[in-house]
C-alpha cells in the first residue's frame, strides 16, 4: 500500500474508516465519532443481518452509546444486495446530517465502501412496456443515437453492441432523467488502519479464539434452529460456512478452527488488495499505523482537514 497521503480540497462532510478484518477500525471509528458528535454507518455486508452477531463481529459494546446505522436491518436468510445498502446509506447520511451530526462510515466490505466513495449510480429501474414498444422498430444506429442523447456521459460502449442491452440502457437512462439524481455531493476524508502482516495474523487468530469462547458455535446452531438453512449459512461464508460444516459433522472441531482461521487470513489479504485497487482508481486513503496510536494519527489528519 502506498504511504502517500492525499487530502480533500474541501471540508469533509463524511469520515470513512476502513481496514481489514481485526484491524481495529470499529474502535477507531467509535472513538472519532465520540469527538465529532458523530454517528456510525456500518459498511459491512454481513452486519446487516439480525442474529448474526458474534460471527460478524458487531461488537456493539464498543459503541458506548454512539448511535449506529445499517446494523440489524435484515433478517438472517435474506439476500441483502448492494442497491439496498446504497439506498439505506443515503437515508442514514441524510438523516444524520439533517440533525447536525457527523456521519462516520466504518467497514471493510470493499464493494460497499467503493459504491459510496465512487458514487455508483444504482437504480432499481422497472421495465417500461410502452417505451420498449416505441423502441422496437428502431435500427441499432437509431437506438445508439437515442442512448447518447439520453445519457451524454456514456462511458460503457459495450451497451451499444447488443440490441437487448441497448434498449435496457435507454430504459435506465431515461428513467433516471425523469427521476432525477438524489445522490449527495460527498467530500469524504478516508482513513485506513493497517498493521504489519504478522501482527494482523496474530490479531485474527486471537480474535477467533475469543469468539469461539463467546459462543459462536451456539450462535450458528441457533440461527439454523430458527430457520436459516445450511445452504444460506454456507452463502454467508467464513465463520458461518465452516461452523455449519462442523455442525453437520463434515469437519472436526480442530479442522474447522484451522480451516476457518486460514480462510480469515486469506480474506484479510483480499480486503487489502481491494483497498489497493481503490487507491489505483483514484480514492485517496490516508493510512494510520495500528500499532502506533491510530487515534492520535487520525486526529492529526482531521485537524488538517477541518
Curated annotation (Swiss-Prot):
ATP binds at residues 19-26. GO terms for biological process: tRNA modification. Residues 44-47 are annotated as: Interaction with substrate tRNA. Its EC number is 2.5.1.75. GO terms for molecular function: ATP binding; tRNA dimethylallyltransferase activity. Signal peptide: none annotated. Belongs to the IPP transferase family. Monomer. It catalyses: adenosine(37) in tRNA + dimethylallyl diphosphate = N(6)-dimethylallyladenosine(37) in tRNA + diphosphate. Keywords: ATP-binding, Magnesium, Nucleotide-binding, Transferase, tRNA processing. Its cofactor is Mg(2+). Pfam families: IPPT. HAMAP family: IPP_trans. The record marks 109 as: Interaction with substrate tRNA. Catalyzes the transfer of a dimethylallyl group onto the adenine at position 37 in tRNAs that read codons beginning with uridine, leading to the formation of N6-(dimethylallyl)adenosine (i(6)A). It comes from the Bacteria. Substrate binds at residues 21-26. This is tRNA dimethylallyltransferase 2.
Amino acid at each position: 500500500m502506498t504511504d502517500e497521503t492525499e487530502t480533500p480540497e474541501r471540508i469533509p462532510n463524511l469520515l470513512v474508516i476502513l481496514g481489514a478484518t481485526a484491524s481495529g477500525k470499529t474502535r477507531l471509528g467509535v472513538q472519532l465519532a465520540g469527538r465529532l458528535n458523530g454517528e456510525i454507518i456500518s459498511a459491512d455486508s454481513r452486519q446487516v443481518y439480525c442474529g448474526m452477531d458474534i460471527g460478524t463481529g458487531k461488537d456493539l459494546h464498543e459503541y458506548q452509546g454512539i448511535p449506529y446505522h445499517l446494523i440489524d436491518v435484515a433478517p438472517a436468510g435474506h439476500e441483502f444486495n448492494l442497491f439496498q445498502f446504497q439506498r439505506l446509506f443515503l437515508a442514514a447520511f441524510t438523516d444524520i446530517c439533517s440533525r447536525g451530526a457527523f456521519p462516520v462510515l466504518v467497514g471493510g466490505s470493499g464493494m460497499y465502501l467503493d459504491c459510496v466513495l465512487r458514487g455508483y449510480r444504482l437504480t432499481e429501474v422497472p421495465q417500461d412496456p410502452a417505451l420498449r414498444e416505441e423502441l422496437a422498430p428502431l435500427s441499432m444506429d437509431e437506438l445508439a443515437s437515442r442512448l447518447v442523447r439520453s445519457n451524454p456521459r456514456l462511458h460503457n460502449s459495450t451497451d451499444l453492441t447488443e440490441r437487448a442491452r441497448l434498449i435496457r440502457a435507454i430504459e435506465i437512462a431515461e428513467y433516471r432523467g425523469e427521476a432525477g439524481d438524489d445522490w449527495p455531493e460527498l467530500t469524504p476524508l478516508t482513513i485506513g488502519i493497517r498493521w504489519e502482516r504478522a501482527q494482523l495474523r496474530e490479531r485474527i487468530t486471537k480474535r477467533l479464539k475469543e469468539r469461539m469462547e463467546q459462543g459462536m458455535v451456539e450462535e450458528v446452531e441457533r440461527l439454523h434452529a430458527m430457520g436459516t438453512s445450511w445452504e444460506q449459512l454456507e452463502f454467508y461464508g467464513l465463520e458461518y460456512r465452516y461452523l455449519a460444516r462442523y455442525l453437520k459433522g463434515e469437519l472436526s472441531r480442530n479442522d474447522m478452527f484451522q480451516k476457518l482461521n486460514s480462510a480469515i487470513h486469506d480474506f484479510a489479504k483480499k480486503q487489502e488488495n481491494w483497498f489497493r485497487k481503490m487507491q489505483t482508481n483514484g480514492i485517496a486513503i490516508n493510512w494510520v499505523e495500528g500499532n502506533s496510536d491510530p487515534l492520535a494519527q487520525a486526529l492529526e489528519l482531521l485537524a488538517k482537514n477541518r
